[in-house]
């Protein structure tokens, strides 16, 4: 994290390289492009599908904080959710809007900052507020959570992912052995322990807070950039059961599920 970073710096960063923008070689904005982005995202991060449980939100109002280029947004809409997405990056937001047009889906998109989005009048109650890998890029996660709390109604479910401090990935970063992923170079990128995350959510007032951990990127970067999935030798040699245990205890993603009572 850059010590004097501003939210405008974060916006500029994601405008220059929207998250997952290189997940396909196809022409950006085409149906094939979006299909390949979706396939790659959920192949590398399959836990997103189970965490979101898209079919559960059929007919429900869903708000996504930080929709990016709209991959998860598309799935919510395809499974029948009444979808609203906000996004800091204008370039990312426009791709998400184009994605819905190309795919023939309905949704509402607004350019907003996670820390101040509660100033916007959504004129609806949300059954789910979802955010995956976003609010750890804010100047104040406390302010972002307060905004989410203010938007939420009694009974609103909240599902949020933030980076995990006690993780394999963070250990590699600390030792200068980091394998770059989407966040590499972002001016603001914080990580949290499960206890810190629990404290943040409970202090804000959320109830029934459940936290799990998942995701270790296991592929060689040069090959991955060429859309080939070749595991690092130590992961290739690791039994599936051991790798599952490693993800559960040292995964890069803290998956937080809570509710506003």
Which role does the model predict for each range below?
Residues 172-182, 195-199, 209-261:
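A C-terminal cap/extension of S-adenosyl-L-methionine-dependent methyltransferases
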Residues 188-205:
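Short alpha-helix
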Residues 30-60:
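Conserved alpha-helix/loop element of class I SAM-dependent methyltransferases that forms part
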Residues 130:
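A conserved beta-strand element that flanks and buttresses the S-adenosyl-L-methionine
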Residues 1-35:
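N-terminal, positively charged/glycine-rich alpha-helical extensions of SAM-dependent methyltransferases
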Residues 157-180:
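Conserved class I S-adenosyl-L-methionine
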Residues 142-157:
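A short glycine-rich, Lys/Arg-flanked "PGG" loop and its adjoining helix->strand segment in the class I
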Residues 60-117:
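Class I SAM-dependent methyltransferase SAM/SAH-binding core
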């Amino acid at each position: 994290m850059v010590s004097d970073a501003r939210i405008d710096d974060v916006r500029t960063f994601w405008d220059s390289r929207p998250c997952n923008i290189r997940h396909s070689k196809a022409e950006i904005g085409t149906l094939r492009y979006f299909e390949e982005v979706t396939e790659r995202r959920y192949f590398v991060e399959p836990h997103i599908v189970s965490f979101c449980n898209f079919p559960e939100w059929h007919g429900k109002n869903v708000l996504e904080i930080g929709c990016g280029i709209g991959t998860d947004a598309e799935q919510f809409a395809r499974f029948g959710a009444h979808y609203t997405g906000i996004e800091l990056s204008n370039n990312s937001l426009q791709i998400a809007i184009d994605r819905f047009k190309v795919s023939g889906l309905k949704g509402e998109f607004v350019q907003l900052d996670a820390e101040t989005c509660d100033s916007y009048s959504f004129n609806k109650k949300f059954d789910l507020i979802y955010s995956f890998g976003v609010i750890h890029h804010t100047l104040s996660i406390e302010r972002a959570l307060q905004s989410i709390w203010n938007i939420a109604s009694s009974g609103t479910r909240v599902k949020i992912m933030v980076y995990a401090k006690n993780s394999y990935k963070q250990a590699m970063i600390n030792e200068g052995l980091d394998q770059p992923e989407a966040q590499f170079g972002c001016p603001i990128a914080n990580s949290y322990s499960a206890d810190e995350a629990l404290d943040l959510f409970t202090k804000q007032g959320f109830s029934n807070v459940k936290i799990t951990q998942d995701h270790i990127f296991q592929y060689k970067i040069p090959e991955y950039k060429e859309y080939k999935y070749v595991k690092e030798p130590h992961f290739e040699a690791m039994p599936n059961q051991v790798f599952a245990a490693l993800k559960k205890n040292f995964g890069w993603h803290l998956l937080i599920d809570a509710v506003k009572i």
